[in-house]
Amino acid sequence: WQGFLEIDPADPASIAANSVSLTRESVRGIDRMGGTILHTSRTDPRTHQATDKTGQVLDVLDKLGIDAMVTLGGDGTLRFSAHLSRLGVKVISIPK
């Protein structure tokens, strides 16, 4: 969720700096790489810096044209994914 919190929906430069479009070419060979390409973090947007950032996450999803998400993670990711689902975001969650 950290990447979503770094994006300012009104600033195209921050979108470009904090997101990557996945294409056939960009994901080719991932299966032969070790480690992770996901750049994970332990951030809960509901408690980030003592301010609920759910609205910002929803704005970023809208700005990026994301109408469904597949989330992979632990308890925190699954909890926030369920929170987004209750708000109408289409989410498929996969526990780690």
Protein language model features and the residues they cover:
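Structural motif
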Residues: 71-72, 94
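Hydrophobic/aromatic ligand-binding patch that stacks against planar heteroaromatic rings
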Residues: 60, 83-84
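Short connector loops at secondary-structure junctions
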Residues: 1-7
